[in-house]
Structure formats: structure tokens, C-alpha cells
Amino acid sequence: ACPNANILRLFKSMGLKIDASSIYEAERAVAAGFDASDISLSTQEFPTDDRLFSLVAKGMSVNACSLNQLERCGTLFPNAKVGLRFNPGLGSGGTQRTNVGGPASSFGIWFEDIDKVKKIVLGHGLEVFRIHTHIGSGSDPEVWVKAVGLSLNLVRSFDAVTVLNLGGGYKVGRMPDEETTDLQAIGAPMREAFERFQS
């Protein structure tokens, strides 16, 4: 979302990559010197075919954020690799604006639509290489741990997945009565969940 080319160039010099939430952000990053292959696009508003083709042809990856987007990806890029953004069924945010998971959120493919997803993937010969979930920027460790479990269950549904992107911000308390995310409280049970998944 950063519009400042100098900051984007600084990020590039640090070896960071871009998680773009619109085609405009992706194009802005390319204009600042990023390779398209360093950009992942997850967007509510799917771009026009020509703009999408241009960056995908140069290596940009796409997370389909709805069944309709997945169908379009399959039509435009049959037999390609694709990421999937799922709504894991729960979210965490200090306000409704920062809570981007759960029934009230329009972000991501609803996790219970997994059979519909598999049908589209199979029909277009797609290879799902990444699962992306994003619950918001809340501080509740219990929600984060549940989201990890749900996300790992989604990973189990696709044999070729090599990347799990657990999205969401870590809340920083700015006012005396606001909580800050306790990374230790979140991190330890998340690590245990990943270790159980690997065993």
C-alpha cells in the first residue's frame, strides 16, 4: 500500500518482497524496481485480463480470493500454479474494520467451500502451491492459535502446497487501555501446532 517509490526501493534493497492487495500496488512496485516474480497479488477487485496477463507473464503469483476468481484464474492460466486465500471462519481485530475473517467478512474463500475449490482446481489442471489466510490485526492469542489449526487443515487438502501465509497484523496498543499482541503467547502454541503437523 506504500505509494512512496523511495521507501519501496529501500524495501527492495533489504530483500523484502511485495504482498499486493491491488493491481495498482503491484504495478507501483514494478515501477519502483521490483521484479514481478517478487510480488504476490491478493485482491478483492480482480484486474482486467490484459493487466493481469502482463504481470503474471513476468512471474507475479496470484492468490484467488473467491470461487469466481479461482474460475477466472483457471480459464486464463490453465495448468498453472495458484495460491488460495481462505476465510478460516474466524477473525481477530480491535474493530470491525480490522477484523477480516469470520462470517461478517467478505475476504477470502469460505473454508467450508473446499469441495467446490477442488472441483475448479481439478477442472482447470491448477496446482495449489500456497494457502493464505488473514484474520485481522487483533491481539487474542486463542484466535490466532485456532486460525493456525484451521489453516493447517486447509494445507492438508492440497498435496502440492509448499507455502502457508498466515496473514494478519500484530496489534500495538497505542492508548493506555489497549492491549498489545503478546508474541510469546501466540508463538509457542503456533510452533507446537507446526511441529505436530510435520510429525
Locate predicted features:
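Active-site-proximal beta-alpha core segment in soluble small-molecule metabolic enzymes
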Residues: 1-163, 189, 193
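Active-site anion/phosphate-binding pocket segments in diverse small-molecule metabolic enzymes
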Residues: 71, 168-199
